[in-house]
Amino acid sequence: MSILLLNPIKWNDYALLDSGEGKKLERFGPYLFSRPEPQAFWSKRLPNEVWSKVAGTFLPSSSLDDNETSGKWLIKSNVLDRWEMSYDNIKFFSTPTPFRHLGFFPDQSPHWDWAAKKITNFIYNSNTETPPKILNLFGYSGLASLHAASNGASVTHIDASKKAINFAFENRDL
């Protein structure tokens, strides 16, 4: 049995640069961030001087002395609260959240591309003027919805969090 490995290929504004010792080093737009990654139990590849250039480091709640239920970011003063990024043909905002991520999940982009291919094939092979309908439950900041819509789908975007819906609207309006 072979394992199917899906790699994000349309990123200009994001890159996984290194991982190891329980962390990952990533570039989000102009900034480098270090985040916990418990499954990265190997040694780091890049030297510490590269890792020391991060704009932000996430500290999980387990590493904090206080009784916070979520972790927190240590962010350098020159980092914007949020900044614009893009993937393929969509624009969106990135922002550090108290949940370890930066407003989206770049590792999900192969799934967006898969859906875009299915949407394009449906439109090309369909005998109808009606676009394919997509229901995106747990849509969060809207990147999967925006990508599907930009490829011709009619998308219903749902999330239980009002904050997430507002974030998705802001991304849509870019």
Describe the residue ranges of each PLM region.
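Generic preference for flexible, low-structure residues
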Residues: 32, 41-44, 48-50, 108-110, ...
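Short, contiguous clusters of charged residues that form electrostatic/catalytic patches at enzyme active sites
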Residues: 106-113, 117, 166
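Short, Gly/Pro- and small/polar-rich lid/capping loops
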Residues: 1-15
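Single, functionally critical "micro-switch" positions that shape active/binding sites
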Residues: 28-29, 137
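Non-catalytic substrate-recognition/targeting regions of SAM-dependent transferases
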Residues: 11-26, 33-106, 113
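Conserved SAM/SAH cofactor-binding pocket of Class I
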Residues: 117-174
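Compositionally biased amphipathic helical and low-complexity segments enriched in hydrophobic
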Residues: 5-6, 75, 123, 147
